[in-house]
């Protein structure tokens, strides 16, 4: 019952009007916790401090209603996401931020300081993160056996929002130490949440003696289950070339094939990039690399460097660029 009232879905998947309606109709919607200026009623212009205070008040209302049930002990949670026929099951817990310092947590993206600062203020004033940092690590048979055993039971939470099914189980106390040991066996890689990570680190720097700022919420998925959906970029062509000249420039990075529609441009293999330009769809297959390492071989890095940077002339990591 509470899941239907509290769980709000992805913030960016809703328009400001939809989020505003959810906040007005449901005082327990988590959109009320993460509200921004665009969610305010028309004609009102709340300050950042007022928005954060309203978010903190909404969270207090949810907690006072006992919508969240504490486990009563340190615990991990098994978390399964199901979407479009794909399941992935991970472990939710508190990630110690020292891992960013000693190389146990690896990142691959720059962050925009203004957004990290905004999330940092939210963390300090509201006192909660809206969603976990998503991590991946090498699959492990021992950890999988524990999760398989845990998820064989009826889930404690089973909720669907926006066609995504979420299920949660509490890992048994007897398995907690074994799960912790397996999670610490290898480095983890941030797949989503670089700004949330930066915000958490900034909070720790401002509150070095507060243990609540020494860790942050995270979920870890095994590498053989994790699926990363498309993250589209809208980038200008600095040279403003006609489509044929642009295709010629793209061809310096790989093979370009014009396709009929967006489905034809959807990447289905590693090294493929869908391109929409001048009302036409193309599939770009990046040339093989002579030398590869863990970072430069990532499709997202090759797209940033070879296509957005080299061809379009846009530095995606420039925090001052639009």
For each feature predicted by the language model, list its residue ranges.
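Surface-exposed, charge/polar-rich loops and edge strands
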Residues: 1-322
């Amino acid at each position: 019952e509470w899941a239907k009232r509290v769980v709000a879905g992805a913030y960016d998947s809703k328009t400001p009007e939809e989020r505003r309606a959810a906040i007005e109709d449901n005082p327990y919607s988590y959109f009320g916790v993460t509200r921004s200026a665009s969610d305010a009623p028309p004609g009102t212009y709340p300050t950042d401090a007022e928005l954060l205070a309203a978010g903190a008040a909404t969270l207090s209302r949810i907690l006072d209603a006992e919508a969240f049930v504490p486990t009563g002990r340190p615990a991990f949670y098994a978390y399964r996401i199901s979407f479009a026929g794909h399941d992935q099951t991970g472990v939710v817990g508190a990630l110690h931020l020292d891992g960013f310092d000693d190389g146990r947590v690896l990142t691959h993206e720059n962050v925009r300081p203004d957004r990290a600062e905004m999330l940092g203020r939210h963390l300090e004033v509201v006192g909660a993160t809206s969603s976990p940092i998503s991590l991946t690590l090498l699959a492990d048979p021992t950890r999988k056996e524990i999760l398989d055993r845990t998820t064989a039971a009826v889930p404690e939470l089973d909720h669907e929002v926006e066609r995504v099914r979420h299920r949660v189980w509490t890992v048994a106390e007897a398995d907690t130490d074994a799960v912790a040991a397996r999670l610490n066996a290898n480095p983890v890689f941030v797949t989503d949440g670089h700004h949330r990570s930066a915000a958490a680190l900034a909070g720790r720097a401002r509150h070095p003696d507060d243990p609540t700022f020494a860790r942050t919420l995270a979920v870890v998925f095994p590498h053989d289950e994790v699926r990363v959906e498309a993250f589209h970029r809208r980038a200008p062509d600095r040279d403003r070339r006609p489509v044929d000249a642009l295709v010629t420039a793209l061809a310096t990075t790989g093979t370009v094939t014009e396709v009929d529609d967006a489905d034809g441009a959807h990447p289905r293999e590693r090294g493929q990039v869908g391109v929409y330009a001048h009302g036409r769809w193309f599939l770009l297959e990046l040339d093989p690399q002579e030398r590869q390492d863990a970072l430069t071989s990532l499709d997202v890095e090759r797209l940033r460097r070879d296509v957005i940077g080299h061809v379009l002339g846009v530095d995606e990591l420039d925090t001052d660029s639009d």
